[in-house]
Amino acid sequence: MIHKLTSEERKTRLEGLPHWTAVPGRDAIQRRLRFADFNEAFGFMTRVAIKAQEMNHHPEWFNVYNRVDITLSTHDADGLTERDIELARFIDGAAAHAQPGA
């Protein structure tokens, strides 16, 4: 079974993820990104999709033109887990050239 993060674990892990915010009413985190154009946004999503498939852990996301909104939560645990934190760190690295959220 996948271990859901405790409140203290969640707080500690999120200190290292300053671009992520809590989703109101859910045990989930969200990040909004904006890229130069659709090609950059889609390229970013492709890199994340490959990693997510390797992890067997898939984000909820929404894309319009150059904007990508991502929500992470582990459905099997009904909340945040280490898998979400690992994927968030990968996303941060992949999005290093992105502009602040839209």
Swiss-Prot record:
Keywords: Lyase. One of its GO terms (biological process) is tetrahydrobiopterin biosynthetic process. The keyword Cytoplasm does not apply. Pfam families: Pterin_4a. It is an enzyme of class 4 (lyase). Its EC number is 4.2.1.96. CDD domains: PCD_DCoH_subfamily_b. Signal peptide: none annotated. Gene3D superfamilies: Transcriptional coactivator/pterin dehydratase. It comes from the Bacteria. One of its GO terms (molecular function) is 4-alpha-hydroxytetrahydrobiopterin dehydratase activity. Belongs to the pterin-4-alpha-carbinolamine dehydratase family. PANTHER family: PTERIN-4-ALPHA-CARBINOLAMINE DEHYDRATASE. This is Putative pterin-4-alpha-carbinolamine dehydratase. It comes from Burkholderia cenocepacia (strain HI2424).
